[in-house]
């Protein structure tokens, strides 16, 4: 056995001997998170993100704290970024696998599954060949609830197969980092479950070496797409769907039925999380989603009722908006719902404090 083979064998064996801490006498990585750090420092991670730590292109944008667009209160909006373009990042263990093809396929399936749930899902590119720059991909998520960049990972060690959700840095001036980590954990747990990887998935962060936005604080994202999304105030994750340098994972990702299954499960994760978030922050009767009950809300209810009575087929922007309009919870929109909204509005205008019910309270009562 030559020296390289001996080292590779030793590293492969150590991956599955994972004590909670690294002993002083053993400098090899022991956990998936330590392995990610090790691979990056040794420059043997074969994934290419397009020289992400250079060419920051948001100079013309104002700072996110001053310009972030608020998501639509009525509609869940997800921006999906299919990683790379053309026939890029081939597997070194299975002929015919290209990361760019997998990400394009999975992203389109995910878009379909989200739309079936009533979510507005959009892509950062229009074809397999389309290859927008990295930060502008993130910028496209302005006003969306979430940005998801779809990838598979690569390394020189073929035994590694854990999924990785790359999340935002810990930030004390916003809560989008909390959303990034929360959704990242849900996604990596789901990908681990669906792909049945041998190693449990992790959430991970990579800090830029530079002050990319020029605010004097070294707290920026290394990954260009995440840097761009964070800059416009959108929580996001770069999701590595295991490693295409692992034989079993690569074969799994080449099966169309598996990608469809994965898309369905990830769509359910995203829909459930953001539907719950919107419900927990929405009053019943607040049809327009502006945070209060008003005459305008009652007018929207009456307009819907009148169109329905005239034999038309009125619609709201989402089922969440319909739920807020159904004030009495009888699964229909009537004049009574509008009257209840007006009564609540009148009490508030008179300085009283009527009881307001959140959509989430009704959903879980």
Which positions does each model-derived feature cover?
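Cellulosome-associated attachment modules in secreted, modular CAZymes
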Residues: 22-27, 279-365
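Catalytic-core regions of hydrolytic enzymes
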Residues: 42-183
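Surface-exposed patches in mature extracellular/periplasmic domains of secreted proteins
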Residues: 119-129, 150, 195-207, 277-280, ...
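Sec-exported extracytoplasmic/periplasmic mature domains
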Residues: 108-119, 142-146, 152, 188-197, ...
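Active-site-adjacent substrate-binding region
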Residues: 180-221
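Sec-dependent N-terminal signal peptides of Gram-positive bacterial secreted proteins and lipoproteins
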Residues: 2-25
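Extracytoplasmic/secreted envelope proteins and their assembly/folding machinery
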Residues: 104-107, 111, 138, 144, ...
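Active-site-adjacent mobile loop/cap segments within catalytic or ligand-binding domains
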Residues: 79, 88, 149-156, 204-280
